């Protein structure tokens, strides 16, 4: 009788293990703690001001689900996500938020640090203007609520959002 119970237990455990769902094809990817999932990517806001290059280097340290970069923005919805993340934590009435767009390699040819195509922009009126050799893009918050993009010196320190793709 003990043999029969042991056999039933082994079979039951075996069937239970075989019936576990394989999430690799249907379960949504998960982001690390403190990251926000949206449309196949993970995002995280960092409020400590860094220069553009420092912020990009910090983002590249994150590799939990894909290589991290300063956030690229492909749509108005994604732009609004970043604005919402920023507005929910910012404490000043003016300031900026680094995004992963720059024309450091060639003036006027803006590229995303993650290599994705530039398919959406939200430049403020008269921007980008390259005033005093500005090569890096940030979301600019103005008192009038015009939270749009501006090119600015890469040496300035701003908060930033990192983005990791979950599809790599």
UniProtKB/Swiss-Prot annotation:
Gene3D superfamilies in alphabetical order: Mannose-Binding Protein A, subunit A
Top-rank taxon, per record: Eukaryota
PROSITE patterns: C_TYPE_LECTIN_1, C_TYPE_LECTIN_2
Every C-type lectin domain range: 38-163
Disulfide bonds: 59-162, 136-154
Signal peptide per UniProt: 1-18
Keyword entries, A-Z: Disulfide bond, Hemagglutinin, Lectin, Signal
Gene Ontology MF terms in the entry: carbohydrate binding
Known role: Alpha-N-acetylgalactosamine-specific lectin. The oligomeric form has Ca(2+)-dependent hemagglutination activity towards sheep erythrocytes. Its hemagglutination activity is inhibited by various monosaccharides, oligosaccharides and glycopeptides, including inhibition by GalNAc, blood group A trisaccharide, Tn antigen, mucin and asialomucin.
Assembly mode: Monomer, homodimer and homooligomer.
PANTHER family: MANNOSE, PHOSPHOLIPASE, LECTIN RECEPTOR RELATED
Protein name: Alpha-N-acetylgalactosamine-specific lectin
């Amino acid at each position: 009788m003990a043999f029969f119970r042991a056999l039933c237990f082994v079979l039951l455990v075996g069937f239970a293990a075989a019936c576990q769902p394989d999430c690799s094809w249907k379960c949504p990817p998960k982001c690390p703690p403190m990251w926000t999932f949206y449309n196949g990517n993970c995002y995280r806001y960092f409020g400590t001001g860094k220069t553009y290059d420092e912020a990009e280097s910090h983002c590249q340290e994150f590799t939990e689900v894909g290589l991290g970069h300063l956030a690229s923005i492909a749509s108005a919805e994604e732009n609004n996500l970043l604005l919402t993340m920023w507005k929910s934590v910012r404490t000043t009435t003016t300031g900026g938020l680094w995004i992963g767009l720059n024309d450091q390699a060639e003036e006027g040819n803006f590229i995303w640090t993650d290599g994705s195509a530039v398919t959406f922009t939200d430049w403020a009126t008269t921007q980008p203007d390259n005033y005093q050799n500005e090569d890096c893009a940030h979301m600019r918050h103005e008192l009038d609520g015009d939270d749009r993009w501006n090119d600015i010196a890469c040496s300035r320190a701003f908060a930033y959002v990192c983005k990791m793709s979950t599809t790599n």
